[in-house]
Amino acid sequence: MLNGPSARELHERVYANWERFYQEGRIDRRTLIKAAMVWAGGAGALGALAACGDEDDDDSGSSMAPTATTGGAAPTTAPEDDGDDADDEPTEAEDDSDDAESGPTGDTLRVIFSESDLPTMDPHMHNLRTGIIAFYHTHDNLGVRNPDTNLIEPWLAESWENIEPTTWEIKLREGITFHNGDPFTAETVKWNWDRITNPEQASQQIGNHAAIESVDVIDEYTVHVHTIEPYPIFVERLQNFQMIPEKLAQEEGDSYLAENPVGTGPYKFVEWRKGQEIILERNDDYWHPDINPPYKNLILRIVPGVPTQLAELLAGTADIVRVVPFDQMAAVDNSGVASTKTQAILRVGFTRLDAMARTAPNPFEDVRVRHAANHACDIQGYIDALQPGGDRTPALLNPKHFGFDPSIEPHEYDPDLARELLAEAGYPDGIDVTWVRGPSSMPNQDQVDQAMQRDLEAVGIRVTFETLSDGLVFTTRHNEGQAGPMHSYNWGSYSVFDADGIYYDMLHSSSIFTYYNNPELDELLEDGRESLDPDERMEIYRKAQRIVRDEAPMIFMWGFHAVWGVSNNVDWSPRADEIDMYFTARPVS
């Protein structure tokens, strides 16, 4: 049985946030009363689901000091008053001249897009989903995915062609300028690729472009991109590679770019209030005729804690939130103020095991212990209770990835077999391990982790949580190899719908993200990213999946079904590639 707060406890937790908003002057008394009445109406619908567990509230903004905790839920800290929400509704005694609507005003769209801040405003110097989303608004890519066909279509590029097995010709749109007036040309494209593939730049995205050997400028609006070997997912990589102005970058340097993003996108950067929000203003000179955002201002807010986020959504001080736990969907949908949007996405969640002793020697170096951990966990039970619609990923790949093999069988829930495997590995009395956790976009992450902890301990794998509330601290530790012997993780494949988008980064021994080393798998992954024959690639990834399943370098979990909360005053839909495009949002008339 999965334990969690009662509907009353959850109601009180959300209402406490509204009281705080009122005390801070962020909402007036009328809004407080209205929000409380709305939530009371939805709380009854929540009751039947609340027993599924506590909300995912282990994230925090970067203004918090990193905190390590032992046990279940992570600490949270309320954000400071950022002072940039729409004005409060007036009370009857207030002057109506200060009136502002609840929800979008027509001028401003307010999105709570993260619980943790970004490390930088440089689109090349991060590996965070929230960074991708933010920079999709200020910058453009050579290609963009069509959500209807799932194909990459030209954007800054006018066309591309594989003119030789290892050469791609890209023709660029003419007449596009950056927000500072610099022109976008072939020199821009070459400079951006040269920068991100330069090892001295130390971009966390270098692996996305490891196949690039060189870029030649043919004329002002044509480049030839040469790959080391034939590169079948070259076009997929074009949809997540934001262009920055080379002249500005050369003149001002990396430190300037880290604070002042300049792109060609539909919104311009205004201000980064660290730990609080990113303020953007519509680019009224945007080059694409079909993109004309109705909101003049877009505010991307950092708000720790799902209860706080939901309180803001239902109080009308936020228009979109990126995470709504499944057990709170009914309350939002019945609120009359907002509704939920559900989308199966490419992101995969898993619990990584340090199979290569990257952090330190540990029991998970033994494959029998790794299989024991997988058999100890009732993955399908967690899906049924906490992740409705989640897709099993028996060898890490999501069914949405090209190369997915549906014949791979997942580990069965078998506690007795788990105990036998531990004993065979020399641990008849079990093991004691630390599980490192950081902020996560997985719905109900806390409940999932706690349920897994109980199941693991039932077979003798005794787990102590180390919860890092600051996402930047967790990412740094993870990438430096200090997140063993086990840690929670999820990966969105940089929105590449191909096995290479997750396997190479998560499992190839050269990756900064990996905690596993297998030369046979490395060779297959290299072959998979070099063959242009789809059938050959399918066979390569079938073999790779069998190795991954047999080696079990992580506890395999599921592909996400994500839930967003959207104000009833806003017409907007999420995407399967998990790149939220808020410039497509429209006010409901």
Residue ranges and their predicted role:
Residues 1-31, 40:
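N-terminal secretory signal peptides
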Residues 34, 38-49, 273, 277, ...:
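Detector for C-terminal structural segments
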Residues 112-164, 194, 262:
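N-terminal lobe/hinge region of extracytoplasmic solute-binding protein
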Residues 115-132, 155-156, 182, 204-205, ...:
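A structural "hinge/loop" feature
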Residues 146-151, 239-293, 297, 416, ...:
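Gly/Pro-rich hinge or "lid" segments in bacterial periplasmic/extracellular proteins
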Residues 161, 205-248, 271-273:
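Surface-exposed binding/hinge segments that line
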Residues 255, 285-331, 462:
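Ligand-site clamp/hinge motif
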Residues 267, 360, 391-424, 439-447:
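Structural transition elements
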